[in-house]
């Protein structure tokens, strides 16, 4: 034990005597370990950590999909209450099965109206998720039936905001929409609903009410508005559950074809949907990137340690000659590396804490509850493992070198292994490795940058600048039919168009990147397609000037008019009294008419109640973002919308327009609440956010990698020049010109750089395929990107070479020859 303590003291004294070396190593490691720990902290919290539910591996979602429709909007559909009831009755593979729905309702508090996020949940939802009331109680099965008192369970956040945690909250009455509810319980603060691969399904409701409160008319039973969750019985696999649900779906297709023909059930686990696929892959790519950065740091430090070992070769030789033994000397160097790594890891945790806060400040998309992301035991264990790994990586080569020290040579000239060809080769190999790894990271970052540039350049098909959006939802009790809805939106448009700074206003229920929806349709006068070949298109019910406001050009035919709006709404009131008109986009014309003329063709919506005649074809845009391309679209003039988006074109500040819109709506209906008024650019930013986040972080890591590689080249080349001062002096003395000296230094430096570039290009070709799903309109092996990345590394390399080269050219031969 005394020997170990003594060795530890000697090692610490040695590091104190070389502060520049120790501080440089600790700083580099703190940065490398810090960013690794930061990314792992997020990865662990978001992807690796178990979900906060009992036996989360047995929890699944149940959805429906059309078997023969390849449209993302129809691949993960919610289900109708009628089907949910049949699943609950017939399925034998589930221990529990529950359903829920998200919405918002207006609440009147002290005469003021505010919007409240409301969850409609079945009585078995909370037991399924292992939730218990913090105070009071949760729903009972009997409260789901009709005729029972309206009860509510509130979130902890709402308990604080609305009732200031007063115990009188239990039993208090709250008015939501047209109903009064009695608060019976409060959920614990840690309760959270599961994430899904469709962001809109995630619920962080302020208030929960029984599921039965969602269904007010018999027609509501067939509306697909429920997300179903279930817990598999112990020992039941997801495949077995899928097989049983397929059988139930087939039975429902026969017994209830109007609702279920052509449908199947899709089962997916909570764990698979806890993070979006894009975020999941992005975090693993970023973790791989920072691990490469760590390897570059280790190579850099290994080179520094080799330089230090060459300077200490005489000391090491004396220790070996005095009987310390080669193994003990090697152990001393490994202990030194371990101490440096330990200090770097401790400081790295501080860097990680700061880096996590900085990364979360960038508001990475799809990360739910970022406030729960923190360094925990798992992260500390990771940091310790990284510290041990780095000690081995950058301490092993010098330790092996020490074990092969030429004792006689070191004692005679102080050169030892430090001046040998072996050390030079090792340094060059490490430089080549640094350059190769830096090129891999730079190539990945360049691919992401080009991809993001393509995404921004492609856009959604029209300019979103100066467009402001406000969502308006009309309560059924005060607006019971299409006529009352149309009257409201007519009046709203008329008033908003007269607001200062407004150059145009329109209404739509199908807004790009926000509220895209699709439906099946029919061609009037043609046979209905079979259920396995449905005709699908996006339906947008808009005011006539919607496309003009977006500045989308007409390609053929004519634009919509106010007369078209009047005729279409009249046809909706009385289908026998005439027909409406509509526009289609170019993608619709290509898909369904090919060489035919679409003008004059008649369409029927899915319920076949309303017919419309095509009067024009408009240019395409990409409603679900550039990655998803254009979609077939139908535009009907109609203001008969229960919920719609008001779109305003204005050059005025958003806050001023928002205030004007809210005052206008308040003047029309005091009980309507406009929660958010946002620029359409906001939705574009959200759509681009994940790629922007990935590109930014990967670019930062690539930049750090390149700086470390340049620092490595500089340190090695400086040492080469310093160790060859006598040789250079002799060359100058016998007539070598500065150009020849310069070429000698350049050859010494650029050989490992060139080797690193070759290896890096090969590695980039092999590894860039892992980025393929994150790229847009650029291939993972894009030759231009690979070439430019290699040229970039080659172009900045002279910055690391310049100072050592100047030193070599400035050597005085007389001074050099007088040195030993």
Predicted regions and their residues:
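Mid-to-C-terminal secondary-structure elements
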Residues: 118-141, 150-281, 357, 444, ...
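Alpha-helical transmembrane segments
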Residues: 31-65, 306, 355-364, 437-466, ...
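Membrane-proximal extracellular/periplasmic loop immediately following the first transmembrane helix
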Residues: 51-104, 223-229, 455, 459-521
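Alpha-helical transmembrane segments of integral membrane proteins
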Residues: 1-22, 270-276, 304-331, 335, ...
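Small-residue-rich transmembrane alpha-helices
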Residues: 39-42, 302, 338-407, 450-451, ...
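Interfacial "coupling" helices/loops that link adjacent transmembrane helices in transporter permeases
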Residues: 297-341, 711-751, 757, 770, ...
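Membrane-helix entry/capping segments
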Residues: 1-23, 53, 112-113, 147, ...
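Short, strongly hydrophobic transmembrane alpha-helices
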Residues: 18-46, 50, 296-298, 341-345, ...
